[in-house]
């Protein structure tokens, strides 16, 4: 991904125009048995967001896509892993980092070719103002993922001690957090 961008962006900067769409994966949001893949794919999102801010002044938009579909790679996931993921997902509480939105779409909707028009659109003139975003393109759906941002913070003058944090975090920053994988009893 880096090398492709490195070699193409030089001409885009000279032209003061360009569109870059990078393929990430919703696995980057957390997927059992794929920590290495998840880290690499979510790294693409960080790369994309950084590029978007760096290249904005040159008229270059940069976005990431979580493409989906039934592929040889998804077909190669062992049934035991699928069962484990399903069991883990059913135990998760308060998270919205699941796969793309479910629908009642027919099997042909999961053809990866359905990603193409959505990705091509991001390269068009009307999409030029869209930059630094992450889109999901599974099936016939298209989703916009929210950017990460600070939701809560705590402050004090000076450094925190572990004891202070132990007292304040449970009633402040961690107050509404739920463990997505609670201990089995």
Q: What are the roles of these predicted feature ranges?
A:
Residues 3, 16, 55, 142, ...:
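ATP-dependent carboxylate/acyl-activation modules
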Residues 3-8, 47-48, 118-122:
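Hydrophobic positions on the long internal alpha-helix
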Residues 7, 15, 124-127:
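Generic structural signal for alpha-helix termini and adjacent loop/cap motifs
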Residues 13-14, 19-43, 48-49, 53-57, ...:
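Catalytic loop of short-chain dehydrogenase/reductase
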Residues 56, 61, 130-132:
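Short, small/polar-rich loop/turn modules that mediate ligand/substrate recognition or access, typified
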Residues 63-71, 133, 138-140:
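Proline-glycine-enriched beta-turn/loop adjacent to the NAD(P) cofactor-binding site
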Residues 86-185:
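C-terminal helical subdomain
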């Amino acid at each position: 991904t880096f090398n492709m961008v490195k070699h193409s962006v030089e001409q885009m900067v000279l032209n003061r125009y360009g569109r870059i769409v990078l393929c990430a994966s919703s696995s980057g949001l957390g997927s059992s048995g794929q920590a290495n893949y998840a880290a690499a794919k979510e790294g693409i999102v960080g790369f994309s967001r950084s590029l978007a801010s760096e290249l904005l002044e040159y008229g270059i938009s940069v976005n990431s896509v979580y493409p989906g579909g039934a592929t040889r790679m998804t077909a190669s996931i062992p049934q035991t892993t699928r069962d484990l993921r399903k069991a883990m997902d059913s135990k998760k509480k308060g998270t919205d980092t699941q796969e793309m939105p479910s629908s009642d779409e027919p099997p042909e909707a999961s053809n990866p070719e359905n990603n193409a028009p959505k990705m091509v659109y991001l390269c068009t003139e009307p999409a030029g103002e869209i930059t630094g975003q992450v889109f999901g393109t599974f099936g016939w759906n298209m989703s916009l993922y929210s950017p990460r941002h600070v939701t809560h913070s705590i402050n004090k003058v000076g450094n925190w001690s572990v004891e202070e944090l132990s007292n304040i975090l449970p009633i402040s920053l961690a107050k509404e957090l739920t463990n997505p994988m609670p201990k089995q009893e």
